[in-house]
Curated annotation (Swiss-Prot):
Family matches, as SUPFAM superfamilies: DBL homology domain (DH-domain) (SSF48065), PH domain-like (SSF50729), SH3-domain (SSF50044)
Gene3D superfamilies in the cross-refs: Dbl homology (DH) domain (1.20.900.10), Pleckstrin-homology domain (PH domain)/Phosphotyrosine-binding domain (PTB) (2.30.29.30), SH3 Domains (2.30.30.40)
Residue intervals of the DH domain: 1158-1342
Gene: Arhgef5
Protein name from the UniProt record: Rho guanine nucleotide exchange factor 5
Posttranslational modification: Activation of SRC induces tyrosine phosphorylation of ARHGEF5.
Record InterPro entries: ARHGEF5/35_N (IPR029212), DBL_dom_sf (IPR035899), DH_dom (IPR000219), Ephexin-like (IPR047271), GDS_CDC24_CS (IPR001331), PH-like_dom_sf (IPR011993), PH_domain (IPR001849), PH_ephexin (IPR047270)
Organism this protein belongs to: Mus musculus
Residue numbers of Phosphoserine PTMs: 446, 953, 969, 1029, 1110
Highest taxon, organism lineage: Eukaryota
Amino acid sequence: MEAEEPEYGVSTEVPDIEELKTIPEGIMRSSQIPALDPEAQEDRDPSYKWTDGHRPVMNQSKVLRDMGDHTPNSMAIFFKKESSDMETSQEILLAEACNTPDQQEAVIQSLKDRLSRTIAAPELLACAVQEEWLDIPSKLDNRVGAELQSELMSLTLAVSKEKEEEETSPDTSIPRGSWPPCKTHPGETEQTQGSGSELLRQGKQLQLEATQENQGQEGFLQSQEAQGLEEQEGQEVEIQEEGTLNEGICFGGLLGEQEEVEEGFNGNEEEQKQGQIQSYMLLGGQWENEGLSGELEGLNYSERGQENRERRVWVLRDSEEEGQDQESREVEERRVATQYTENQRLVEKSEIVKRKQRDHDQTGKVMPVRDQKEVVDSGDRVQGNGDSGGQTAVEGSRPGEDSKPSLPVASVDPEVLSPGTLFPGISSSVADIPQIQKEPVCEELSPQAPALEPTEWSHQPISPPASFAPEESLDNRTHNSQQEEFRLRKGIEVVSASTSVAPSGTRDSPPFSPPNVFSSTATLSPVSSSVILPEETPTASASADTPHHCGPCETPPLPAKSSRYPCATSDTANPHSPLSSYTGVTQHLRSNSFPGSHRTEQTPDSLGMSLSFSHLELPQRPPKPAIYGSLTPRRNRRSRDGIVFSDSSTALFALKQDSEEFTSNPERPSSPHGSPTWGSPQNSAFAIGSPANVSSPPTVSMDMTIREALLPIPPEKRHSYSHIVERDGLLHEVASTLKRHSHPPPLTLSSGLHRSSKGSFSLVPDSTVARQHRPLPSTPESPNHTQTSIPSRLRYNKPLPPTPDMPEFYHPSISSSYISRMYRPLPPVPIIDPSSEPPPLPPKSRGRSKSIQGGVIHSGGQAKPRPNNQDWTASTLSVGRTSWPPATGRSTESLPLTSRCNNEVSPGLAFSNMTNLLSPSSPTTPWIPDLQRPTTKDESGLTEESEPPVRGSFRRSAPQEEFNNTRRSALGSRKNSEKPLHHQLEKASSWPHRRDPARTSESSSEQVVLGQVPNKQKGWNRQGLRRPSILPESSSDLRNPAAGRLPGSSDSVVFREKKPKEGMGGFSRRCSKLISSQLLYQEYSDVVLNKEIQSQQRLDSLAEPHGLSSPRHRRKALVSSDSYLQRLSMASSGSLWQEIPVVRNSTVLLSMTHEDQKLQEAKFELIVSEASYLRSLNIAVDHFQHSAQLRGTLSNQDHQWLFSRLQDVRDVSTTFLSDLEENFENNIFSFQVCDVVLNHAADFHRVYLPYVTNQTYQERTFQSLMNSNSSFREVLEKLESDPICQRLSLKSFLILPFQRITRLKLLLQNILKRTQPGSSEEAEATKAHHALEKLIRDCNSNVQRMRRTEELIYLSQKIEFECKIFPLISQSRWLVKSGELTALEFSVSPGLRRKLTTRPVHLHLFNDCLLLSRPREGSRFLVFDHAPFSSIRGEKCEMKLHGPHKNLFRLFLLHNAQGTQVEFLFRTETQSEKLRWISALAMPREELDLLECYDSPQVQCLRAYKPRENDELALEKADVVMVTQQSSDGWLEGVRLSDGEQGWFPVQQVEFISNPEVRAQNLKEAHRVKTAKLQLVEQQV
C-alpha cells in the first residue's frame, strides 16, 4: 500500500489552481462538476449544458476558493477538451500531479468529488445525460477552454510546485489551492476525454449506485435539472475539481463529461467518476439519479433552490411513482448505456489506464486500478458530496434502476459540490482537512430519506483548508487520502469495472431519490463538505452548518439547510467520497456504529461533517422504506427529513478497512479486477467512488420503511448489490441491508484512511471520538433501522439532535498503527439457524458493543474472523437488515428484500446495522454471549465508541422500528417477531422489560430474542398494577429463562416478596407468571371494599325509587379523602380478570354472559387478594419478625406471644397462592379456585386456628410492650417508618391472618352466589365456603373461649356473694352483657305516702344466669340475688312517668336465689341501652326467613366497627346488615346477611339502602348461600 501511496514529495500544481480561481463562472462550475474532456463533454447530457447555462446560487467566491483548492485538477479537466495539446499537457500535469500516491489519491478524490457532484443528478446522467455530457464538456471547453489553456501551464507549474511542496512537507497540510492533484494516468485523462460514454457509464453506474441510495431522495430529480446541475457542477467542479481532480467523477454522462474534462487534465476525474460510479452503485442507483440531480441542482441553485428542487423532486417523485415503470425503463435504458459504457471504461481502465481510457473513450474506459481507487476515493467523496456519484455509478452499473427517471432533487450547487467541497482529499480545502479520510460516507448518505430537502451541505462551497481541523496537514491528509485513494482506486477500479459492468438495464438499483441525492451529494463531498463546513455558505457541507467536523460523528443536526444536506452527505457519501475520505468521517462511520475494527479516526472536520451529515435535514418528504445503513448512527444521524445516516456508510468504511484486511490492498495484491465482487453489480456498488461503497445497493436497499416518503423504487431498481468497499485497494462487500442513514457517513475508503502511518493525519479517532461518532443501534424490537424505520415523512424531516457520547469530537493525530488497531474488523457474527430465533437484545452496557465487536466483516463473501476467535461466518445482510451484526447467522436471503432490492441481495458486510443486531428479528438466532466477551485492546475503542450510540439508537429506534416492522411487508416474519411485544417499550415504558431494559440486557445469559418470548399472555398487570408485589427469591424466579425478563416485564407477574434473609425453612415458593400485586393487603382490602361499597351505591342510586323513604335513611357518601382513594385506585384496575390482555383480546368474553363474567371476576379476585395478602405477610415476617434489632428488645416469651406462628401462616399462604396461580395459568378462561381452597382447608385450620386463638394474648403483649418497653417502642417506630411498610403499623400486620380468613370466606360466598344452581361448581363452592365458615367459627369459638374464661376468672375475683354461693367459673359460661342500671323503688311512708327511691344495681348477664349486685369500692360487687336465665324476663315499662324517668324497663325474676318471684324496675340513660337490655334479656329468637323480610331496612357498612361490648356486632366494610330495630339515639340492631350474626352497632358506621330492588337482591343472594349450606349439611348427614 505504501508503494502505491502518492509520494509526499510530489509537487502539485497549486499555481494552476490559484489561476483557476479567477476562471470564469462557467469554468468554475465545470471545475466544481467533474470536468470531462471535450469528448466527455460532448458525451454529457444536455443537463450538463443546462448546468453550464445556470450557475448555482452558491457563492462563486467560495466555489473559486474551493476551485482554488482544487483548481489544478479542474483546470486540467477543462483543458482536456480544448486541445490535444492541452490534453497532453493536462495528462502530463495529471501524471505529474499524480506521480505520488497522494496526488493520485487526490486525483481520485477529485474524481470522486466530480463524480459525487455529477451523481447529484444521477438519473439525469442515467437518462438523457449521456448525450449532453459530451455536448456540455465541449461547451465548457469552448467557454473556459481558452482560459483553462492559458492557465493550464500555470496549473501544471502549480501542480509541480505542489508536488514539490508535498515532497518537501508531506505531513504539512496542503494549503488551499495547492492541493496536489492526484496522479492520473494520461490514459485516464484521455479516457475521460475520449470516453464521454465511458464516463457516462461510470457516472451512470455511480448514479445507479447513488440512485439506489439516493433513490428515495434524488430519484425524483429530473434528468434535466440533474443534467443542468451537472453542467454547472461540471463547470464548477471542473474548477474545483482542478483542485480536486481525483475527486471529480462523472456521474452518469454529465459527470462523465466533466470528469473526462477534468481527467483530460488530471486523468483523475475519470477515476473519480468511476469512484463516484461505484459510490453511486453503492448508493443503489438511487443516489445515482437523485444524487446527480440533487448535486447538480445544488450546484446550480442556492439552498433555497435546492429546497425548491427538492420539493419539485418530491412532486416529480410522486409523478415518478405514477409513471415509475415507464421512467424506470427509460432511466434503465440510459443507465444501461451509461453503465455499459462506464463499465467498459472502468474495466478497460486498469493499470494501463491511459491506453485503456483512450481505447475506450467512446466505448467506456476502464480506469486503472489506481484511477479506480481514485474514483473510489472520489466516489467516496462523491458519496460524501451526495451519493449522486455513487448513484451515477449505480446508474451506470444498474441502468435498470435508472430506467425509472428519478425526479430531480435540488441539486447541490457546483460550488457546494466543488472538488474541495466534495473531495477534501483532492481539493486544497480537503487538504486542509488533516484527518479527512476517504471513507465511504455515502453509505449512510445514500440510504438517507428520499428526496432530501435542499441539502445545503452540497451547496456549501469548499471551505479553505483553515475550515478543517489544522491538526493534520492538508498535505498529509491529501497525501494519505490520495494514497488511499490510489489504493482504493486500484482495488476499486476492478470493483468499478465490475460495478460498471453491472447491466445498466438492471432495474434493481432504484433511481435516485432527491433526498438521497442531497445526502449523496453531501456524502460525495464529505471532504468538500468538511471543507465546506468551514464555509459559512448555507449550502456548505453538513460540517459547514454544523461544527460536525469537530464534533462526534453524531454531530448535532446542521441548520435546516446545510444540516439536511450534510445529513444527506453523510448518508450518501461513498466510503470514498470526500467526506467519507475525511478521516473523521470515516472514523465517524466506523467508530460510531460500524463493527469493523478499522474505524478510522475522523478528523475534526470530517467528524463535523459526518455529524452534520448525520443531521442533514432531508426533504420534507420521508424517504421510501428502503433499507439504509445497517447501523443506526446516533440520533444525530437521522436527518431532519427523517433520513438516518446509513450505518452502511460506516459499515462500508469498516468494510473498506476490513476489506483492506480481507480484500487485496495495493499492498495486498488486488488486480484492477482483483475483486470480482466489485465487478458484480453489488460489488460495483463499491466500485470506485461509487456510493455503493457506503450506501451501495444495501444503501440502495435502504430501509424502505425509512424511505417511506419516497416513492418506493421498483424492487428491480432496488435490487441490492453486494457492497464491497475497497480500502487501500481492498474490496469490501457491504451488506445491502446496511441502512445508510443509520450510520454516520463512513469516511471515504481512500487508502489514506486505512494506511497505517502514511498519512500525516491519522485517520483513526480516539476511542472517545469513535464512540461519539458511532451511530446508536436501532431498537431491538424492530429489525429495521430504528431511524430509517420512520414511516412518516415528517419523521424524516426532523433531524435527530446529536448525541455524542464523548465530549471529545475527534483526535486527528492518531497513529496509523493505532488506526489499524481501532479499525480492526470485528469478528463475524456466528451464523446460526436463521429460522431458529432472532438475536436477543445485546446488553445495554459495554457488553453489548463488546459482543458486537466480536465479529467478522464479510467482504466479497470473505469473512475474516476477528479477535474473538469464534468460528463465525459473516452472513450477508439482506437489504432490509438493520442490525449491526446481522441477526446472527442471518443470511441476506433469509429476509425478503425490500422493493428496492428485489433482484438480489448483496453479500454485504458481515455486520449490518447495529440496530438490527439489537432489534430482534424473527428468523435469527439469539445473541451469543460469546459476542459479549470483553473486547480486545484493539477493539476497545470501537466498543467504547459504539456502546453509547447503541443505547441511544436502541432507545430511539423502538418506535421507529415498530413502524418499520409495519412497513416492511417483505420482512413479514421478521416484522412479526420484531413487533415490540410492547409494540408495547410501553409505551415500551409500560412494559416491565421496557421499563427496565438494562437488567434484561445486562444479563447476557438471560438474553433472549424478544420475538421468541411467549405471547400467551402479555403482562396484563401493566393495565394497572404498578409493580410486582413480591420479589422472587432469585432472579431466576422472576425471569423466565425463555424471556429473560423481569416478572413484571413478562406476560405474568409474580406476587412474591423476597424471602426473609433467614429463609423460609427450606420452603420454596413458586413465582407467579400472571398475577401481580402492588399493594399491601391492608390497602388492597380497603380498595376492594370501597369498590363494593361504591358498586352498591351505584346500584342504589340507579334504582332509586321515585318516592324517597324516610329522610334519615338517605344514603351517605362514603367518607374518605380523595388522596387516599387515589393512592388506592390502582389496585382495582389490576384486579379484573377481563383486563388481562389475553382475555381482553380473545373472543371468549363475547360468548360469556354477564353472570359468567362476574363469576370469573370473583374467582380471580380471590387469587389477586391472596397475592396481596402474601405480600403483607412477607413484610411482617421479613421486616419485623426477623429484625435483629427488634428481637434484641424482646424476651423469648414476648417474642413468641407477639409473633406466634406468623411464619407458618406465611408459608401456607405461599403454597396456597402457588396452587391458585398454577391452576389459573393452566386454564385462564375457565379456571377453578374452590377445589384449591378445599385442598388447603386442613392447612388453614392447622395454622390459622392457633394463631387466631392466640390473638388475645398477642394484643395484650403488644400493648404491654408499648407501655413498658421503651427500646422496643423506639425500634418499632424505626421499623414502621421504613417505606416498605407504607406507613402501616406492626399491629395492622399482626391482625391480617384473621382478617384474611374472614375475607376469604366472603370471597367464596361471592363465588357461590354466582354459580349455576345444581352445578358441580356450586357444590365445590359450597363445600369450600362451608369449610371456611367452620374454620372461622372454630376460630371465633377459641377466641371467645379464652376471653370468656378470662372474664369469668376476673369476675370471680371481684364478686362476693351475700346470698347462696355457686361456682362462677365454668367452661360453658360466658358473659353476655353487664352494666350498671338505676333501680327505682317506691316505699310507703307511715303517712301512706309513696316515696320513690333509687339505687344503683349492677347486672351481669351470663348465658345461663343473671347476677344482681351492688357496686362496692375497688370495682368490687356484692351479689344480693341471682336467677337462672330461664327464669328471667324483661319487658318494656308502659308507665308514663314524667321527668327524668323515661327509659324504664321491667325485669322479672321468676325464681330467684330464695326461690321466690321478684320484680325490678330499671332506668337507663339512653333508649338504646334500654332496648339493648331488653333484647339481651329476651329469649333467643328463631332464625328469620330472609325472603319474608323484604320490607326490612338494610344498611351497608361504610367503616369497620369493633365491638366494645359483647352484645355488639363486629362490622367490616361493605357488610350488609338487615336492621331489626333502631333506637332514637343512633344505634341499630341487625342481622348480618353473610353469616346471620346479630348485634348492635352505631348508625354512624353504616348507610341505609333505600332501593327495595337492591334489598331484595341482597336477601336473595343471602338465601341462596343459606340454602346451599343446608343442602350440603343434609348431604353430609
